[in-house]
């Protein structure tokens, strides 16, 4: 079996009490099934920790220390966090009525040092969320303005689609890569744009979902297989213990569904996870420009582990790179940086995209 020639979905249940699973992620087929089994079997028994506040914090710290893939890249002094957080956990009275809240808040605080939207602590009463990866970035989206452009849109396969600028430009808004679509859906969408000069593909506020859907959509914009990046997984407990890079390809799909005319992809800081991988891949598609803000990142595929008390921590365990070998964890910059003004009266990213397509059309031989 040749590397990178097809994709295998890994959707395994939790393997052990400290097992793991990959969520909504697709990997290229590896050189042999033994490599896949080796990856799945890389989980080993951690130091046995007591089911106490301090024991759970120690277990959480060790899981991140040994399995999280961005400790070195983000220059995090993870070692320095262990003792202070365990000491604070030891001060929690396990018999206190709010002990579970105290422990949760302490763990969430520790995890937020990672600044990673793929890192979550799941409990029966709350889920931790990191927001630092998108806070403080300029706005590229206004929901009220956006609705005006969708007034006459049709909807199928998770995509709103319509035409703009006197029916001369196609427009698609895809709000989540969790929404499935078929080749037939794409056929009807693209057929409705047959007389259009170009296409605006809007993935702002798209927080991700299936990497398979992301690459299937990207395949619409190429007529040949295209290398778009690489991935690596942890293979040891050291912060830099990774497998060799494996290539990621976007493969040509149904040849009926090809769009090779000018295309503008709109992105913002909330374009995260699978959407981040999508815009990274689209940089290698002909006739495509990225417009908007730096995407949100989330260039690590997630894995989950269970703590002694039954809570689950999810974190990034597989690193993804672009075709030049650069990490996409911190986001993908657009070709043209743009944002909404403080008091917008129109969606100027959409209007800017229309201008770019019209300019390209006016300066072409048609």
Go through each PLM region and give its residues.
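Polar/charged alpha-helical tracts
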Residues: 17-23, 80-83, 147-151, 339, ...
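Short linear motifs in intrinsically disordered/low-complexity regions
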Residues: 8, 12-13, 127, 167-168, ...
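Flexible, low-complexity junctional segments that flank or bridge functional domains
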Residues: 41-233, 240-247, 262, 304, ...
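Intrinsically disordered, low-complexity segments enriched in small/polar residues
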Residues: 2, 17, 29, 36-39, ...
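Bacterial Sec-dependent N-terminal signal peptides
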Residues: 1-50, 365-366
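Short regulatory "switch" loops immediately downstream of catalytic or recognition motifs
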Residues: 1-7, 88-93, 320
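C-terminal "post-core" interaction segments
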Residues: 43-64, 207-366
